[in-house]
Design a protein with these regions (language model features):
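Iron-sulfur-associated redox domains of electron-transfer enzymes in respiratory
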Residues: 1-173
Length: 173
């Protein structure tokens, strides 16, 4: 593309960098934990439905946290009950899928993490043997501590994301 457009990088003037997506939300931080994707998504669902950001306990869906292989919860947002499941490991995902097929269970939203406990136990993490529950809990709690300290707790609070929606996509939802 550069050759085609005859752009010579050496002759370009220095300028500031494009900070697009240079900031993140704490919702992205908790993606590393089992239930973190669900929790971040539920925060956004709350924002979309109420047109305001969640506060207090609505920022911390503790019922879906932890390292259990299968977690279920019913979350009430805007008078609507949402049945959710969080699954750790593909073996348990297979079991839950079979239950869904057999109409034994129903969920509105399911999060599946291949690594038990979430990415905190994944291949990209420092390997400590044995990787026990205590270590997983410490990693998980560190991410939740970081989440709690941040000012931008929902993706839609991120000024870069707001700019993208304002200028390209329109309203979220």
């Amino acid at each position: 593309y550069l050759k085609k457009e005859k752009i010579n990088l050496a002759k370009l003037k220095n300028s500031g960098y494009n900070s697009l997506l240079g900031k993140g939300s704490s919702g992205g931080i908790i993606f590393g934990t089992s239930g973190g994707v669900m929790e971040a998504t539920l925060r956004e669902v709350y924002h979309i439905l109420y047109k305001r950001y969640p506060k207090g306990r609505l920022l911390n869906f503790k019922s879906i946290r932890g390292t259990s292989n299968v977690k279920e919860a019913v979350v009430k947002i805007n008078g609507t009950y949402i049945k959710v499941a969080i699954i750790n490991g593909t073996g348990d995902a297979r079991k839950v899928i079979e239950k869904i097929k057999n109409k034994e269970v129903y969920y509105d939203f399911i999060e599946v993490m291949t690594c038990e406990g979430g990415c905190i136990s994944g291949g990209g993490q420092p390997r400590v043997f044995p990787l026990n529950k205590n270590l997983k809990d410490k990693r998980m709690n560190a991410l939740y501590k970081s989440d709690k300290r941040m000012k931008i707790r929902c993706a839609s609070m991120n000024p870069d994301i707001k700019d993208i929606y304002d200028n390209f996509f329109g309203e979220v939802g």
